[in-house]
Amino acid sequence: MDVPKPLPSSLSSFAAPGDVMVRPLLLKPQWMNGLSERLLVSHYVNNYGGALRRLNAIRKRLAGLDWARAPAFEINGLKREELIAASSVILHEIYFDSLGGKGDSPPTGREEPPAELARALERDFGSVAAWRAEFTAIAKALAGGSGWAILAWSARLGRLVNQWAADHAHGLAAATPILALDMYEHAYHLDFGAKAAAYVDQAMGNLNWERIGARYRSAIGEQSEDKLFLPYGSPAQEEARISPEELKAALADAGDRRPVLLDVCLPKDLARRTDMLPGATVRAPGALARWVDDLPRGRPIAVYCICGFQVSGKTVTELRQRGYDAKAVSGGITAWHAIGGATVPLELSTYEDLAQVR
């Protein structure tokens, strides 16, 4: 059997020195039914981003530890916190990946599991409806406390299992999560207050079954579609994308290889914005022909929008067709926020379609 190709994930960063890299949002927050953009962005930036930043800080502490002399309490404390932070990062990535309907359009609430996964759910739970009833009951039972409801593949048990987890590090040994529902209060309080059950019902109507199915195929050793794990509209070519971490390092260069920053955003989306990356120029993507000749030919160009979807992707494609060294910032300014990147107040004086901003 061929070795399955791993899904694109910040998990790969664990095998290399340095920071674990942020994973872009694959959903459009404003498209979710019954889950507000404010809730989802706050959850991603503050809770997922906070866990990611905490994990990287812990890893730096561990890298400098003198293992021969470090006291047991320090080793225990750091390794415990590393486990909690790493598990939080991974479960949050699976959670956000699992939401978003079909990805290229708002969820309808009528999406169904792909055939292979549906057959597995029927085999292991009797029916898709029976699985859903059990999974949602587990999630709702966690209301008022904290934890995760997880659907995981266990090779040892030879089946899919619904898992109750009281915290980030509470998991079935050697099982591979394919769906995770965050039941910590931060996942729902802004929209639902204490009504956790209402949040569960709304979240279950926003699932992206294509990506959940891809995780299942990867877990059982089959190939998965990598394109499902890129933000919709993001350039497929790796050389046309730059991570927020790579951009942060590149911006530290004071020379002629320092990227030119372009903030491209539709007028209707700018109305929701308050900040931008330092040194960026805000341009209207629909007016590219009017400003493209102002760009320097000898400098790399980093293009970002809110979440790194088709607005920045289309702009980068057009710039590269015109011979510019342009790259889309994966995850947009939302992922930049999640890594704690600096911003300044939004300045719209250069925006060509300012009259359309509402």
What are these regions (language model features)?
Residues 224-253, 259, 267-302, 307-358:
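Rhodanese-like catalytic fold shared by cysteine-dependent sulfurtransferases
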Residues 2-229:
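Feature for soluble, non-membrane regions of globular proteins
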Residues 63, 194, 255-256, 341:
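Residue-level recognition of short, well-ordered coil/turn positions
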